[in-house]
Swiss-Prot record:
The keyword Chloroplast does not apply. This is Ornithine carbamoyltransferase. It comes from Mycobacterium tuberculosis (strain ATCC 25618 / H37Rv). Carbamoyl phosphate binds at residues 50-53, 77, 101, 128-131, 264-265, 292. It comes from the Bacteria. Pathway: Amino-acid biosynthesis; L-arginine biosynthesis; L-arginine from L-ornithine and carbamoyl phosphate: step 1/3. GO terms for biological process: arginine biosynthetic process via ornithine; citrulline biosynthetic process; L-arginine biosynthetic process. The gene is argF. It is an enzyme of class 2 (transferase).
Length: 307
């Protein structure tokens, strides 16, 4: 059976743990260990600009002994009038996996519905599951066991990071809180899915408009840009509601004394996070960015071994 990774709950708790364990192993020996069997080609398609996703996937595939074919959709027939389904059928004859950074989640779902190779969500408007695998790897490195930790996210609760942290976090047994202003809350269907998964793992889901309450005693504090790609023209009116949710030294002081800070990047310093926090001793941002490489390599190996 072909396994896809389109959203965080595509992995069971046990499967997520397997991927994270493999990511830790690959990080110990990132170059010489090349576990892909035979020549492997991977299509890496971008509808949106990228730094970390492009470098980490392209280099990671090479380190595994595979070959990445990296294109932007505008340079293919996908950017014109060929259907997603036709593109998926053709690419499935050429490559062993498809990695796609795109807009609506429905585009990934449509491609996966006919692809005969694994399809990986490298970011959509709704989810960012590869990033959250890297986040979980980083948390495990700093904190040890994930189960029972308290993670609080601050900012736009309706964006892809909030959604993926909800699903991926509770899958790992983490208690996840989303602190966001009214009008920017998680999608109800995503929250419901996270609550169902949390029942299986002993985790919990909390959504609040009180940033201070969310920070109190937290083990992990996470934020993301207040203006996602495609929202740049919304102006200052969009930014204003998020000001009380800035991840700054005052908010960090409310958390556990050993708390860590994550940001998937790029950061708008002075908006969602201050320099003092991002560059301070609690920051694990740079480890988090590096772990995109290792977590995605592990995911590719895991999927290809099972497809």
């Amino acid at each position: 059976m072909i396994r896809h990774f389109l959203r965080d709950d595509d992995l069971s708790p046990a499967e997520q743990a397997e991927v994270l364990e493999l990511a830790a192993e690959l990080k110990k020996d990132p170059v010489s260990r090349r576990p892909l069997q035979g020549p492997r080609g991977v299509a890496v398609i971008f509808d949106k600009n990228s730094t970390r996703t492009r470098f980490s996937f392209e280099l990671g595939i090479a380190q595994l002994g595979g070959h990445a074919v990296v294109v932007d959709s505008g340079s293919t027939q996908l950017g014109r009038d060929e259907t997603l389904q036709d593109t998926a059928k053709v690419l499935s004859r050429y490559v062993d996996a498809i990695v796609w950074r795109t807009f609506g989640q429905e585009r990934l779902d449509a491609m996966a519905s006919v692809a005969t190779v694994p399809v990986i969500n490298a970011l959509s408007d709704e989810f960012h599951p590869c990033q959250v695998l890297a986040d979980l790897q980083t948390i495990a490195e700093r904190k040890g066991a994930l189960r029972g930790l308290r993670l609080s996210y601050f900012g736009d609760g309706a964006n892809n990071m909030a959604h993926s942290l909800l699903l991926g976090g509770v899958t790992a047994g983490i208690h996840v809180t989303v602190a966001a202003p009214e009008g920017f809350l998680p999608d109800p269907s995503v929250r419901a899915a996270a609550e169902r998964r949390a029942q299986d793992t002993g985790a919990s889901v909390t959504v609040t408009a009180d940033a201070h309450a969310a920070a109190a005693g937290a083990d992990v504090l996470v934020t993301d840009t207040w203006t996602s790609m495609g929202q740049e023209n919304d102006g200052l009116d969009r930014v204003k509601p998020f000001r009380p949710f800035q991840l700054n030294s005052r908010l960090l002081a409310l958390a556990d004394s050993d708390a860590i800070v994550l940001h998937c990047l790029p950061a708008h310093r002075g908006d969602e996070i201050t320099d003092a926090v991002m560059d301070g001793p609690a920051s694990a941002v740079w480890d988090e960015a590096e772990n995109r490489l290792h977590a995605q390599k592990a995911l590719l190996v895991w999927l290809l071994e099972r497809s």
